[in-house]
């Protein structure tokens, strides 16, 4: 019906190309327009002004001879004031953009090692965008944004990279574990040293108390029982301690202590050895 009355509708964010007898005449903005077909006017086609996206996958090789697939995402749109150029100058817009992307990526990536490609992907995207902007502006197109969205190495290389990463993490974990064990051993040794020191203090105080008690016992017994000597008192004390020791050993069900020599006569020998040691020490001085 619109063609019958020579009226055409152009949608929003779209322009129409008007021709007369096959020659470009005008760009029709969104709205209703009169196109008198009987005077040779017609619509050659429509051109969208919306932002479009094209994903380009490019296979190339890095400087260290690793094959990678670089995926670039190109966002572009036709310029309203250059709609006639965008419509007539390019027959395959996506193919043209793809060709420029291939050219820039395959010129940039081979100069970089694989790790540098990942680190400098923004610089690669900027180079692609600058080259596309310079080339496509002559055809009535604007490059809105260019992104390197993915860098995919060869499967074998990817597996090797994962193994290297895993090995590095295991090495760090092993170092941390060894450091923790080292600290634990140091703390354990410090604890044992402190324990032995305190135990030594306790034993020293215990022996001092025993000596003080024996001295008081000998002096008290000698005073209260006339005619007894210090030797007699010491023999009695040693016998008493002997029986106390044997009692404690027998009372413990799981005792691993063995009292040698175990006979009562051994107390006399012990006492004699102590006296001989004291006499020898006195003579030495």
Curated annotation (Swiss-Prot):
A lipid is attached at residue 2 (N-myristoyl glycine). Residues 118-190 form a coiled coil. Induction: Up-regulated by pathogens during an incompatible interaction, but not upon infection by a virulent pathogen. Up-regulated by salicylic acid, abscisic acid, ethylene and methyl jasmonate. Keywords: Coiled coil, Lipoprotein, Myristate. Transmembrane segments: none annotated. InterPro entries: Band7/mec-2_domain, Band_7, Band_7/SPFH_dom_sf. Constitutively expressed in stems, roots and flowers, but not in leaves and fruits. Pfam families: Band_7. Positive regulator of hypersensitive response (HR)-like cell death. May be involved in potassium ion channel regulation. Homo- and heterodimer. Interacts with LRR1 (via LRR domain). This is Hypersensitive-induced reaction 1 protein. The lineage of its organism: Eukaryota, Viridiplantae, Streptophyta, Embryophyta, Tracheophyta.
């Amino acid at each position: 019906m619109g063609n019958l009355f020579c009226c055409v509708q152009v949608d929003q964010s779209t322009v129409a190309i008007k021709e007369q007898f096959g020659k470009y005449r005008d760009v029709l903005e969104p709205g209703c327009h009169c196109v008198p077909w009987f005077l040779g006017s017609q619509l050659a086609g429509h051109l969208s002004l919306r932002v479009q996206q094209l994903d380009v996958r490019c296979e190339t090789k890095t400087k260290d001879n690793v094959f990678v697939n670089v995926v670039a995402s190109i966002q572009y749109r036709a310029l309203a004031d250059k709609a006639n150029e965008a419509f007539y100058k390019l027959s395959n817009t996506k193919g043209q953009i793809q060709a420029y992307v291939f050219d820039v990526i395959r010129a940039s990536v081979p100069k970089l090692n694989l790790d540098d490609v990942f680190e400098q992907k923004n610089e690669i995207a900027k180079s692609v965008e600058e080259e596309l902007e310079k080339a496509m502006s002559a055809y009535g197109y604007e490059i809105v944004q260019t992104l390197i969205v993915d860098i995919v190495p060869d499967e074998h290389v990817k597996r090797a990279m994962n193994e290297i990463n895993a090995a590095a993490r295991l090495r760090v974990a092993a170092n941390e574990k060894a450091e923790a064990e080292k600290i634990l051993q140091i703390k354990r040794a410090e604890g044992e040293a402190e324990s032995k020191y305190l135990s030594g203090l306790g034993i020293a105080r215990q022996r001092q108390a025993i000596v003080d008690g024996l001295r008081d016992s000998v002096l008290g017994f000698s005073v209260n029982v006339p005619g007894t000597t210090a030797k007699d008192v010491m023999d009695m004390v040693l016998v008493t301690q002997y029986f106390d020791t044997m009692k404690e050993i027998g009372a413990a069900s799981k005792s691993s202590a063995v009292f040698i020599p175990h006979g009562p006569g051994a107390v006399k020998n012990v006492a004699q050895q102590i006296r001989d040691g004291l006499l020898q020490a006195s003579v030495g001085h």
